[in-house]
Design a protein with these regions (language model features):
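Active-site loop/oxyanion-hole signature of alpha/beta-hydrolase fold enzymes
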Residues: 16, 60-101
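Alpha/beta-hydrolase fold catalytic core
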Residues: 1-34, 55-57, 95-96, 251-256
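Flexible "cap/lid" loop of the alpha/beta hydrolase fold
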Residues: 111, 115, 122-155
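Conserved HGGG/HGGXW glycine-rich cap/lid loop of the alpha/beta-hydrolase fold
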Residues: 20-72
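Conserved serine/cysteine hydrolase catalytic core
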Residues: 194-245
Length: 257
């Protein structure tokens, strides 16, 4: 880990590969902030957050399976498999009732974790993610999700680097960081395409059609004035989100930094 003087790197073996993660426990009686980066991002995505919190709270962040240090890793695993591995790692580290902060795909994983272990989580913060439900997606989004791999394979790598970094962050720091994380898949463009278009994860998303009752309260954060379309999107999110009596903060349309 490039920063994180207090963080300790550990690993966990699964049938599909070895997961690497970083953890700092200062008091087992305190809550633990569990940071889950999104697709193609890794633990570096949250380096500023872990640097700030690591001396104040228990902190955990991982490189998700098939990402960064958690490679090589076979791709025949599902989102529910990832949630089970996450739970097993947290048990191993004696982390109970965490607050999970999930960015993009990390938010999907957090929702899967809540579905499987509803009494093993203290709170959920979603950063630029969406409900884990097919009903939330448009027909075009579903069509693209099912055909993503060939589309990414024909996308010129340099153009993809430029579009990916600019589309994920607004600051120079955030864009440079995202570019650096994407470059860890260079020069194997096909590996990046397979990761982005993982069919097992897509199946997990597309088969989930149920709605969930919102029982907590939500906070919306945005860096610019919210238009009615964003407010409507947020309200849909709140109506369908899995919440078990704790509060939820939704950073809607937030840049990934």
């Amino acid at each position: 880990m490039e920063r994180g003087r207090e963080m300790t790197e550990n690993s966990y073996n699964t049938p599909c590969g070895c997961i690497h993660y970083f953890v700092n426990i200062i008091d087992k009686q305190k809550i633990t902030l569990v940071f889950l980066p999104g697709l193609t991002a890794d633990h570096r995505l949250f380096e500023k957050q872990t640097e700030y919190f690591e001396k104040k709270q228990n902190v955990f962040v991982w490189d998700a399976p098939s990402h960064a240090l958690s490679r090589p890793f076979t791709n025949n695993y599902s989102l529910s498999d990832m949630a089970e591995w996450l739970y097993e790692i947290l048990v191993k580290e004696e982390i109970y009732n965490p607050i999970i902060i999930g960015q993009s795909m990390g938010g999907y994983l957090a929702q899967m974790y809540m579905e499987l272990y509803p009494d093993k989580i203290k709170g959920f913060i979603s950063i630029d993610s969406a409900p884990l439900q097919k009903s939330y997606m448009t027909a075009m989004e579903i069509w693209l999700l099912e055909r993503a791999e060939p589309l990414y394979k024909i996308y010129p790598w340099k153009a993809l680097l430029r579009a990916g970094s600019r589309g994920c962050a607004e600051t120079d720091y955030g864009q440079n960081l995202m570019r650096k994380m994407m470059m860890s898949y260079n020069p194997d463009h096909k590996e990046y395409a397979r990761l982005v278009a993982d069919r097992e994860k897509a199946k997990d998303i597309l088969k989930r059609v149920n709605y969930y009752r919102f029982t907590g309260y939500a906070l919306q954060f945005r860096q610019e004035p919210s238009g009615s379309d964003y407010i409507e999107k947020a309200e849909v999110y709140y109506r369908t989100q899995i919440v078990y009596g704790f509060s939820i903060a939704k950073c809607i349309e937030a840049p990934h930094d």
